[in-house]
Structures are given as C-alpha cells and as structure tokens.
Amino acid sequence: SGKTTTLAAMLDHVNTFRRENIITIEDPIEYLHKDKKSTISQREVGMDVQMFSRGLRACLREDPDVILVGEMRDLDTIETALLAAETGHLVLSTLHTLDAPESINRIISVFAPHHQRQVRLQLSSILRAIISMRLVPRMDGQGRVPAVEVMITTPYIQECIAEKEKTGLIRDAIAAGVSQYGMQTFDQSIYQLYRDGYISFEQGMKYSTNSEAFKLRVMGIQSTLDIALEEMEKSMSKVERFEEGEGAKEE
C-alpha cells in the first residue's frame, strides 16, 4: 500500500538535509540508504535483531536522533516506541489501519483498560502526525495513484486524543484543517483526484469513506457535513487568531 516507500522517502529527506544519527529496524530491509548528512544504521529482524521490540530497546542505548520501526505489531513494540518518542527521539513507524482515528484507537486498545487513560494523555503529547494511504486504480489504466489522509496534531486534535468521548471528532477536525494546517481526509483527497482526472467516478465511490458525500460533491451539492465543516474551519481560525493575539500580549 506504499507505506514502506513513503517511510523510505521521509528517511531519505532527513538523511539529505539534517545531521542526525538514524537507526532503522525493518522486516525485511527493502531500501538501502547510504550516509549523506546523517549517519544511518539499518537492522533487519531475524538477521541483526530477534524482534522489533528488542531491537528498539537496544538502539535506545546508542543515542539515536531518529528511529524507524518498520511496523508496530505488538504491545511491547508500541510501548517502547511511545517511550522513545517521549524521551525526545523522532520515531517513524507503520500500522495496518484504515485511517488516523483507527490508528489512534489501535495504539490505545493494545493496552489494558486501566492503562488506557494514561496512554491517551501520553499519545496526545508526543504524536506529531499520521499519514494514511489508499492506492486507487488510475482511470488511464497506468497503475495506481495514492489517496492520502494527513492529520497534524493540532491543540484541538490533542484534546480529541486525550478525551475518549472526543475521538470521534478527529475526522471532522482533519477535514476542517485543510487551509490552516494543510490537513486532508481521504474523501477530500479522493475528490481532488477525481476532479484532476486521475480516477473515475466509480473508483471514487468505491474508495471514499463516505460515498454519498462524494456523490453530492461531484453533483455540486453541499452536504450538511460540508456546511458544518466550513463553519468548524471558521471557528478554528478564530480560535487560532485569538491564541496568537494572547501570546503576543504576553510577550
């Protein structure tokens, strides 16, 4: 689904432009990286380390700046990855989930119920972004094109992660943060791919999270959800401007 290639591209960007100590733990290693501005050490599960969690714990003793964990498969790996991020490391990893809200719920759900409240608070403070991807067949038959959901952890989304009853609001917050934060939902991405002529209407309907809303957008009709999101985006902008103004006063 493009996860490995996307991670490799992100890692190459860091390697090209920043002086960092990078350690990767992968299963298997699919892209070989050479040192550029950064130094990079790649380790393969089954060859260099026994499992993701053990490799992750071992690399923390080597003072890495950036850690790539090929996949967070179990509680031990997720718990160690959260600890690594909490102690100042940039941690990049993947999950087999559909979108940002499901990724957040997956991370939290692997912990025992009596620990989940603390994990929510921890995750809300360290998570920086979630990128989700669906590969949609191109209309011209030349392979597939990625529909991409991007969630940036804004103060409001931090609040939604920390409070269980607000997690369901994350998707709407992503949709409302297009112009201000550069976020987008799958449905917004798929609609843009359709408008740009990359995918057919049928594929747009098939891969959309809310196919009825996609159909209404194509017909030029605003759904009640679209109207609500526009109002939400305006409200978020007002709050952001207010917070910036208050910060300026304090300075």
List where the protein language model places each region.
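Short, flexible helix-loop junctions that flank or precede catalytic/ligand sites
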Residues: 1-251
